[in-house]
């Protein structure tokens, strides 16, 4: 199963496609650790806020240098436009604005123990946790039509959010689940 990783190169976003296992190994091995550490050191100065397209904007020159990961689908660019190659049924829950790094680690460790969790990791701020889950249609498989994919994606996001809220015993902010 492939996911899409977007890196800013100047004013362009460059798409790279990775197998989920390879991306998980890169996160676990700390291949981005230098960039993550630098981001965490200055994050409190950045005044970050989320844009409508899902990106995080900052008032810091150069912005956040971490790549953006699209877990929901495998994309490629064709004549400058994004084209979905394959929807993979992955949804990301974001547990944001935790009080401390230690609390984020605690939430990550709890999420790792739940059978629905495919992958979880700390966000760039060190005070958030990203939890990746997968859904399937009853009987297996995934929807193929764009509108069915959007509805299915929203449904699995809401189901996952509800399940994790019950396990964590606190509210997880609703963030519109995105396919890109």
Question: Across the structure, where does each feature detected by a protein language model lie?
Answer:
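Short, conserved phosphate-binding/catalytic loop or strand-edge motifs used
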Residues: 123-138
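Short regulatory "switch" loops immediately downstream of catalytic or recognition motifs
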Residues: 47-49, 75, 134-142
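DNA replication initiation on ssDNA origins
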Residues: 1-89
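Hydrophobic, Leu/Ile/Phe/Ala-enriched alpha-helical segments that form helix-helix packing faces
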Residues: 46, 50, 55, 111-115, ...
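DNA replication initiation modules
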Residues: 3-11, 80-102, 136-180
């Amino acid at each position: 199963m492939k996911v899409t990783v977007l890196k800013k190169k100047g004013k362009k976003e460059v798409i790279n496609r990775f197998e989920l296992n390879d991306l998980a190994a890169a996160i676990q091995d700390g291949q981005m650790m230098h960039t993550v550490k630098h981001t965490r050191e200055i994050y409190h100065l950045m005044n970050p806020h989320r844009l409508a397209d899902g990106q995080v904007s900052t008032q810091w020159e150069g912005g956040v240098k971490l790549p953006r990961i699209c877990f929901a689908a495998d994309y490629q660019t064709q004549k400058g436009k994004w084209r979905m190659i394959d929807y993979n049924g992955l949804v990301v829950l974001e547990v944001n604005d935790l009080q401390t790094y230690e609390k984020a680690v605690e939430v990550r460790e709890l999420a790792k123990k739940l059978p629905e969790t495919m992958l979880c990791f700390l966000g760039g701020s060190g005070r958030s946790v990203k939890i990746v889950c997968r859904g399937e249609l009853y009987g297996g498989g995934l929807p193929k039509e764009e509108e069915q994919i959007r509805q299915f994606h929203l449904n699995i996001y809401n189901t996952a959010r509800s399940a994790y809220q019950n396990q964590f015993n606190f509210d997880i902010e609703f963030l519109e689940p995105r396919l890109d």
